[in-house]
Amino acid sequence: MPPKFDPTEIKIVYLRCVGGEVGATSALAPKVGPLGLSPKKIGEDIAKATQDWKGLKVTCKLTIQNRVAKIDVVPSAASLIVKELKEPPRDRKKVKNVKHNGDLTVDTIIKIARIMRPRSMAKKLEGTVKEILGTAQSVGCTIDGQHPHDIIESIANGEIEIPAQ
């Protein structure tokens, strides 16, 4: 028999979900059911919390204490980039593996890098900016009309100055 569940204990559960949609409660049930929470209610709360990430895949962090769930959205670099492109949300069921062809500025990339900084493995902000540029390359967008890899090279050569913090 497993030990009795301690209500004051803080449990953290990470979930991948699509913003603004109530995910499959069948996926939530095994994660939150044993903690004494209703998967349906959690699903609705997640949909509410991820409203401004409509149609994008984001990671949600559920912090559960005393049978109350607090939901934080932990966006990936890719979803931050796609959100900054300000493209209209697409129908996920019809359009698959979409290539984004927007254009971002270096300042926007630095802004995204600052958001991602705590989770980055880089020593300096410059390294985090390069990580974000690599993701931008995968997403398929351009930076100031240039390919992201050209920007990475010009940062490495010192042509583009990245602030220390």
UniProtKB/Swiss-Prot annotation:
One of its GO terms (cellular component) is cytosolic large ribosomal subunit. It comes from the Eukaryota. The keyword RNA-binding applies. The keyword RNA-binding applies. One of its GO terms (molecular function) is structural constituent of ribosome. InterPro entries: Ribosomal_uL11 (IPR000911), Ribosomal_uL11_C (IPR020783), Ribosomal_uL11_C_sf (IPR036769), Ribosomal_uL11_CS (IPR020785), Ribosomal_uL11_N (IPR020784), Ribosomal_uL11_N_sf (IPR036796). GO terms for biological process: regulation of alternative mRNA splicing, via spliceosome; translation. PROSITE patterns: RIBOSOMAL_L11 (PS00359). Keywords: Ribonucleoprotein, Ribosomal protein, RNA-binding. Belongs to the universal ribosomal protein uL11 family. Binds directly to 26S ribosomal RNA. PANTHER family: 60S RIBOSOMAL PROTEIN L12, LARGE RIBOSOMAL SUBUNIT PROTEIN UL11. This is Large ribosomal subunit protein uL11. It comes from Caenorhabditis elegans. The lineage of its organism: Eukaryota, Metazoa, Ecdysozoa, Nematoda, Chromadorea. The gene is rpl-12.
